[in-house]
Amino acid sequence: MAIAEEPAQAPVIQRIALVIQYLGQGFCGWQRQPRQRSVQGELESAIAAVVGHPVSVQSAGRTDTGVHAAAQVAHFETTSPIPAHRWPSVLNGRLTPDLNIRAAAIVPANWHARFSASYRRYRYTIYTDPCPNLFLNSYVWHYYQAPLCENQMQAALQTLVGYHHLAAFQRSGSKRQHAWVHVQDAWVRRRDSLIEIEVQASGFLYGMIRLLVGLLVQVGEGSRSLESFTDIWVNQRRDRVRHAAPPQGLCLLRIGYPDSPFPVDAWFDTQPLFVLPSSRNDSESLSPCAVSLG
């Protein structure tokens, strides 16, 4: 009597979430584009080479050409048994130095990098010293043509906090059905020659931060009043927002989730060194003469 074979078990599908860093100048942006180098395309190729089947990598947000990410989040599905903690080292061995996996986690099947997120946080950095800095050029907008008043810029930016219709800060070509944005937090601060502009929102419009920064600089230099700034976005005068800040000063800092699947230390050491707090006194004390070699 023949023994019936047990049916083969279907492979288990796992959804893997990643924390990703990249330098934007080498990519056409996040989204896959024909015959162009994209972050999504590079990741999908690297993952497919590891697991042996095509994958679709979905992100929390689509950064534009030249925009950096300190902690982008994305997910993909696979039947590979590779444990979550090994994914960073496995993928980083196949990726180029301008694209890096910081952390990975197994998430539920209904978890989505984009739709499960509660906020995105961006930082834009402006360098105001007249002398260029070769170590900053690729990560800041070098703007020195006029002095900028960060207090005026802060006053203008604060008018956006809340739930507002911000069509004035949306580039043409957007597929979004509406222009309502919940800005949760926003501030401007100066550290020596660096002016940092941070905005946190539930979501962002296409090109929003760069258009916003371009207008804030006009407020900071005094060529546009606070009243004019407010009138532009309240009355949706998109035709008056003519200049977008360059992409290299913009960095996606973090994606927030109600129940983050990543350990707390996954977010450590994810920001460029020049934006980390430092003490001028400490740096001045580190002269070669003060170092003992004996």
Swiss-Prot record:
The active site is at 64 (nucleophile). InterPro entries: PsdUridine_synth_cat_dom_sf (IPR020103), PsdUridine_synth_TruA (IPR001406), PsdUridine_synth_TruA_a/b_dom (IPR020097), PsdUridine_synth_TruA_C (IPR020095), TruA/RsuA/RluB/E/F_N (IPR020094). It is an enzyme of class 5 (isomerase). Its EC number is 5.4.99.12. The keyword tRNA processing applies. Substrate binds at residue 122. It catalyses: uridine(38/39/40) in tRNA = pseudouridine(38/39/40) in tRNA. GO terms for biological process: tRNA pseudouridine synthesis. Keywords: Isomerase, tRNA processing. One of its GO terms (molecular function) is tRNA pseudouridine(38-40) synthase activity. SUPFAM superfamilies: Pseudouridine synthase. The keyword Isomerase applies. Belongs to the tRNA pseudouridine synthase TruA family. Formation of pseudouridine at positions 38, 39 and 40 in the anticodon stem and loop of transfer RNAs. Homodimer. This is tRNA pseudouridine synthase A. It comes from Synechococcus sp. (strain ATCC 27144 / PCC 6301 / SAUG 1402/1). The lineage of its organism: Bacteria, Bacillati, Cyanobacteriota, Cyanophyceae, Synechococcales.
